[in-house]
Amino acid sequence: MFQSQKDGKKSAKGVILGYDLGHQFAQISYCTGDGAEPETVSAVTGTEQYNIPAVLCKRAGVGQWYYGKEAVKFAREEGGILVEDLLMLAQRGEDVMVEGEAFDPAALLALFVKRSLSLLNIRLSLYQVDALMFTVEELTPRMVDVLSRVAAGLQLKAKTICFQNHLESFYAYTLHQDEELRKNDVVIFEYNTSLRMLRLECNQRTSPMVVLIEQMEFPDVLRRVWAQEEQEREKQKQELDQLFAHTVRETLEEGIVSTIFLLGDGFKEGWAKESLKLLCRGRRVFQGNNLYSKGACYAMMERLNPSAEWKKHVYLGADKLKSNVGMKALRRGEDSYYAILDAGTNWYEAASDFDVILEEGNTVDFLITPLTGGGVMGRQVHLAGIPDRPRAATRLNIHVEMTAVNQASVTIEDLGFGELFPPSGKAWTATIQV
């Protein structure tokens, strides 16, 4: 439920969920919409085991399904049929055969998500959930389609369900940390199968402050299969420690890093000793694995009711609109700027529909203002064959919609002007570079 505040904003009265859906595990965090810090649901009551194995298990011969740790246990001890890689199967879209029966992979994924949400029952009712943010490693068009089907299958009462990638969750999480922790660059080292680094940089000289996130992969820093013999195992750990320390020196030698987050099960194996000392030199270092689900909560909180700090920043990721799109307009007799699309919006969500009065001429001019540098650029749409009418006697409906990260489709329709000048029925379509 939304409640109107005195300042006209809307705030979430209920609960916000952040759901991190991975190929191997899922995590669930939740918070109220009043700015409270998110909490993460444990897969085992009374522990900090946040990872929920993203698997299902079917009991042989009957239509009974188990999920998560219970599914793994039932498959191991009772001979159930284990279905793994649910996210990958849903992306492929091919039927999953279990005991000769075909199952829709998106429906199986929705079943897993629905069952996993039952972990919330001892804390809250799902009827209290107003908004849900899914976060995944990479948000492709196919992934959006899969998540949309999953969301529909959940049959939640939530008014808002959105999707974002891990980079956006990292950004949202960072902006909700103490300012001292994000005074300079913020880095994630993520170590599951192989090592990945994310580096968040903020240009504090721009308004709004532009945030960029650099990604680096280190395929040579792979998870180790530890030897049984203790001496050989210790040698493996020392070699990995040295390799990671070398990677840290190479990647962090430029710029200043305030904070480092170590994510992933690979950092839980007790090998990072000298490299950890190196990381801690003049930097704050945190270890955990629930950053993305918490970041998803924060992102949804900001989407519903943006904070003052959020409004000061704009994240320009790969899928984000890099420029503001607007036009000059006359308001109450004074020249002004009319904002159409805002930089920092996901390009596939960026659209605007509005009416204007054409003052004169037969063109509509747009202003493109890049936040990554460079001057303001003009884009013009020519209205061929528009009826000749007196000054300011033509009303136009304009629809602008992004069709790619740097391209917008513009549709303009002649609405005429009251009874004096009926609509001509003419419409114009153009593509502009943004």
Regions found by a protein language model. Give the residues of each.
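Conserved phosphate-binding catalytic cores of ATP/NTP-utilizing and phosphoryl-transfer enzymes
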Residues: 1-14, 156-188, 291-309, 390
